[in-house]
Amino acid sequence: MILRRGLVLALVVGAAVLASVLLRGGGHDNPTVARVGGEPITQKQLDPVVDHFRLEAKAEGKPFPDNGSAAFRRVRNRLLDLLVYRTELRQAAARLGVKATEVEVVRRLQGSGSAEPGEAIRDSFEYGSVEAQLLLERISAKVTSGIKAPTRAELAARRNRALSRYLARVERETQVRYEPGYAPGP
């Protein structure tokens, strides 16, 4: 009887530890590097973005910092900040009731020449960039829908100010927590 209780207790504790690891970001092979409003950004999300820029630098004949160097950490952390911004956009869009579907993102990519019809999107950075652009367009339309002005130039200026104020508020009000060693610097 005591052995059975001990086994049950061990299973319960083990399940709790496993659940805790999964909720924190997937364990050691995919640690959480930041949280945006409670939503994790993981190492497996950050790595392809870093790889994208590493390949871009190579294609342009420019150096890319070596892994582990201080310069690499600065670049990596700036790229993480980009993922944080995109996550803030997705969360803000959801609160406003706007979205960008996978089909819309792929169509925009195909229209830009980044992907051929029927071709799989291989670069998650490009996909995320197009998704963010579509969301920003829809957020802008929603936030600026009631703005009026006597001229087109003044209308554009008023809309730009309203969108800037909205995005600044989103950034200010969204709680972002970076894991040690990942916070973007000045």
Please name every model-derived segment:
Residues 8, 115-119, 123, 150, ...:
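Proteins with a high burden of low-complexity, intrinsically disordered sequence enriched in S/T/G/P/A and R
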Residues 121-125, 130, 137-181:
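Acidic/polar surface patches and capping/hinge elements
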Residues 20-21, 110, 132-137:
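A ubiquitous, low-specificity "background" feature that marks scattered single residues
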Residues 27-130:
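N-terminal targeting/tethering segments
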Residues 1-74, 160-186:
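Short, low-structural-confidence N-terminal segments
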Residues 4-5, 76, 86, 138, ...:
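Basic side chains
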Residues 18-22, 92, 142:
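Hydrophobic membrane-targeting alpha-helices
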